[in-house]
């Protein structure tokens, strides 16, 4: 927390320079020395005020005899009592009040030949009566009356302001429209490539399906030809198990008749039909 002076009408803080062009130093109140503390408070004009251990007085309120120097450092003597206090308001507040008050400049003196400021033309419907008052040598006031015809209003230029934003909007939309068109063309090309790839895959699938059917037909023909070339002597026996778990029927292609293997208790009831 920065140090500051607690004396009335004093606003010195740490880092400022004093009257001797040296940094202002701060000293705590002698809270443990009652008589000396009362002397400090009497010189400050705050006899009924009780300072705390965190409040200080700056070196500007002590005379040079209240200090002692050791190795270039300024120390406060044990019996030093502050005696320099300002009873008026601080100069800073005076400067602040002066700066807040705006100087009132006197009005410039009127000149005889000073032209009147021109006011904006106000359209009127009829003649205007103008009264001019001015000091003269003969009488205190001279009244001059004249009739003025109203001026025709100046032609206002055609409003072309709304066209400018429209042109700016068109010029701003041109690049955006071109970018969107390029993007659409790019997407169309990608779609065409995907369609070509899909058609190629469909043709390949049809070709593979046809080849698989042709190979299956060839295998069937080969089996048929091999079966025709083999004689009855070279026929093989095929075993087919059908029915329930108690019936097993064996079929053979050789001249031997088919045999039926079954359990003894089921021979008379379960006979497979030819």
UniProtKB/Swiss-Prot annotation:
PROSITE patterns: ZF_THAP (PS50950). InterPro entries: THAP_domain_protein (IPR052224), THAP_Znf (IPR006612). Keywords: DNA-binding, Metal-binding, Zinc, Zinc-finger. Residues 83-121 are annotated as: Disordered. The keyword Cytoplasm does not apply. A zinc finger (THAP-type) spans 1-85. GO terms for molecular function: DNA binding; zinc ion binding. This is THAP domain-containing protein 8. It comes from Homo sapiens. The gene is THAP8.
């Amino acid at each position: 927390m920065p140090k500051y002076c607690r004396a009335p009408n004093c606003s010195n803080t740490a880092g400022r320079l004093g009257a001797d062009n040296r940094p202002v130093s701060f000293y705590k109140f002698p809270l443990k020395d009652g008589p000396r503390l009362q002397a400090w408070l009497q010189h400050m004009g705050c006899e009924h005020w009780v300072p705390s251990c965190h409040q200080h007085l700056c070196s500007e309120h002590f005379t040079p005899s209240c200090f002692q120097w050791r190795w270039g450092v300024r120390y406060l003597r044990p019996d030093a009592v502050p005696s320099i206090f300002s009873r008026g308001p601080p100069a800073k507040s005076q400067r602040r009040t002066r700066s807040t008050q705006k100087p009132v400049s006197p009005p410039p003196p009127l000149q005889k030949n000073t032209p009147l400021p021109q006011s904006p033309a106000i359209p009127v419907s009829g003649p205007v009566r103008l009264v001019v008052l001015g000091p003269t040598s003969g009488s205190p006031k001279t009244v001059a009356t004249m009739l003025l015809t109203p001026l025709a209003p100046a032609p206002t230029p055609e409003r072309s302001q709304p066209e400018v934003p429209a042109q700016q909007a068109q010029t701003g939309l041109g690049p955006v429209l071109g970018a969107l068109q390029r993007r659409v063309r790019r997407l169309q090309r990608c779609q065409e490539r995907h369609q070509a790839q899909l058609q190629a895959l469909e043709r390949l699938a049809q070709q593979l399906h046809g080849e698989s059917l042709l190979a299956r037909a060839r295998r069937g023909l080969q089996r048929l030809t091999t079966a025709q070339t083999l004689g009855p002597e070279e026929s093989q026996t095929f075993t087919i198990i059908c029915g329930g778990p108690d019936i097993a029927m064996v079929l053979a292609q050789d001249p031997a008749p088919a045999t039926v293997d079954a359990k003894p208790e089921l021979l008379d009831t379960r006979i497979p039909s030819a």
